[in-house]
């Protein structure tokens, strides 16, 4: 089902773990603050993208945590609905990580599967800290129709 294995909880009151497909601009929009506010709050380098698995501190001055979570969930559900409108998971395989392999490399170059989908199939793996030898379940997708 859409949204299954999607953990968007707020940690420690004002922090989240960045999910695949999210940008600083998304968080700023959902919170109704400027991206620069989040850059300062998190002591980030300007114009450097945030990473999947990274903890990000949030500013709830203009939006409640519940409203933020609703917006974030709607964004992710939209991505999944669009994807599953055109593709289905036909099978899975196990991939043992080799030195130098990253989620991005597996997602974009090796298997052509969205990073968020790999994350859904590996809920107990910290995809932000992958090391050689870790075994990932990779969903194999096919176009519908």
Task: Label each region the model flagged.
Residues 1-145:
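Extracytoplasmic low-complexity/disordered linkers and repeat tracts associated with LysM-containing
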């Amino acid at each position: 089902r859409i949204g299954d294995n999607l953990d968007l909880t707020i940690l420690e009151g004002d922090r989240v773990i960045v999910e695949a497909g999210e940008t600083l601009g998304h968080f700023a929009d959902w919170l109704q603050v400027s991206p620069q506010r989040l850059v300062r709050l998190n002591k980030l380098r300007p114009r450097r993208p945030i990473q999947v698995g990274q903890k990000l501190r949030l500013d709830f001055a203009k939006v409640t945590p519940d409203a933020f979570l609703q917006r974030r969930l709607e964004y992710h559900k939209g991505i999944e609905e669009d994807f599953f409108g055109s593709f289905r998971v036909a099978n899975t395989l196990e991939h043992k990580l080799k030195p130098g392999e990253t989620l991005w490399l597996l997602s974009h170059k090796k298997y052509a599967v969205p990073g968020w989908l790999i994350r859904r199939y590996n809920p107990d793996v910290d995809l932000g800290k992958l090391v050689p030898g870790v075994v990932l379940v990779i969903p194999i997708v096919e176009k519908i129709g």
